[in-house]
From Swiss-Prot:
<feature type="region of interest" description="Disordered">
    <location>
        <begin position="99"/>
        <end position="126"/>
    </location>
</feature>
<feature type="modified residue" description="Phosphoserine">
    <location>
        <position position="7"/>
    </location>
</feature>
<keyword id="KW-0677">Repeat</keyword>
<keyword id="KW-0802">TPR repeat</keyword>
<feature type="compositionally biased region" description="Pro residues">
    <location>
        <begin position="106"/>
        <end position="116"/>
    </location>
</feature>
<feature type="region of interest" description="Disordered">
    <location>
        <begin position="1"/>
        <end position="57"/>
    </location>
</feature>
<dbReference type="InterPro" id="IPR019734">
    <property type="entry name" value="TPR_rpt"/>
</dbReference>
<feature type="modified residue" description="Phosphoserine">
    <location>
        <position position="27"/>
    </location>
</feature>
<feature type="compositionally biased region" description="Pro residues">
    <location>
        <begin position="16"/>
        <end position="31"/>
    </location>
</feature>
<comment type="similarity">
    <text>Belongs to the TTC9 family.</text>
</comment>
<keyword id="KW-0597">Phosphoprotein</keyword>
<protein>
    <recommendedName>
        <fullName>Tetratricopeptide repeat protein 9B</fullName>
    </recommendedName>
</protein>
<dbReference type="Pfam" id="PF07719">
    <property type="entry name" value="TPR_2"/>
</dbReference>
<feature type="repeat" description="TPR 1">
    <location>
        <begin position="65"/>
        <end position="99"/>
    </location>
</feature>
<dbReference type="InterPro" id="IPR039663">
    <property type="entry name" value="AIP/AIPL1/TTC9"/>
</dbReference>
<dbReference type="InterPro" id="IPR013105">
    <property type="entry name" value="TPR_2"/>
</dbReference>
<feature type="repeat" description="TPR 2">
    <location>
        <begin position="171"/>
        <end position="204"/>
    </location>
</feature>
Length: 239
């Protein structure tokens, strides 16, 4: 196996009947034609893909994901935010395909000792590429969403938390999560994320401004609760 190539650790099992072309170079040792005559009668059902097809599909999905991410970055620089969002979503779909989906049109193998053990496993290099691309896509999606005329703060919160699952020290995701929780009315969580962002960037004026806004909201809510409680007690006394 060539070093640095995007190829799966596990390959498909040997097909019961070899294709008319030579086997791929990355076939595992010992793979070859199965039982049955080359010129015998056709077996019912589709013929399994040759060994290496899953690796080609995986490689193709990863390349497509990186390409879509690059297109999204270009659209963002050109302030085409809706187009950028579409590109990032397509990149994420390709990453999902790379992390377990079988190639399009490939039937599930019949159970038995010769069936494939499952989707191709990612090598360490491939896993790092998937993770970094995924984080960049979600991080960029939040930036695009915050540029929208009507911001979907629930989606911003969701994507920020996905980034923080992989990179707990990501400043932008922490700060944007605080913004999302603030606009969703969850001021306690907003303050927690914003203070965490301030601990990483103590002089960031945007972070400091949102901390002040959040504290004002929390104080106002506290006063409203006190007034509501006092009013309830007054009504009880009068009644």
């Amino acid at each position: 196996m060539q070093r640095g190539a995007l190829s799966p650790v596990l390959m498909l099992s040997a097909a019961p009947e070899p294709p008319p072309r030579p086997p791929p170079a990355l076939s595992p040792p010992g793979s070859g034609p199965g039982s049955g005559s080359r010129h015998g009668s056709a077996r019912p059902g589709p013929t399994p893909e040759p060994s290496g097809s899953l690796g080609a599909a995986l490689d193709s999905s990863l390349r497509a994901a990186v390409a879509f991410k690059a297109e999204g970055q270009r659209c963002y620089r050109e302030k085409k935010f809706r187009e950028a969002i579409g590109k990032y979503h397509r990149a994420l779909l390709q990453l999902k395909a790379a992390q377990g989906a079988r190639p399009s049109g490939l039937p599930a193998p019949a159970p038995g000792p010769t069936s494939s053990p499952g989707p191709a496993r990612l090598s360490e290099e491939q896993r790092r590429l998937v993770e970094s691309t995924e984080v960049e896509c979600y991080d960029s999606l939040t930036a695009c969403l915050l540029q929208s005329e009507l911001v979907n703060y629930e989606r911003v919160r969701e994507y920020c938390l996905k980034v923080l699952e992989k990179q707990q020290g990501n400043f932008k995701a922490t700060y944007r999560a605080g913004i999302a929780f603030y606009h969703l009315g969850d001021y306690a969580r907003a303050l927690r994320y914003l203070q965490e962002a301030r601990s990483r960037e103590p002089t960031d004026t945007n972070v400091l401004r949102y901390i002040q806004l959040t504290q004002l909201k929390m104080n106002r809510c506290s006063l409203q609760r006190e007034d509501s409680g006092a009013g309830s007690q007054t009504r009880d006394v009068i009644g």
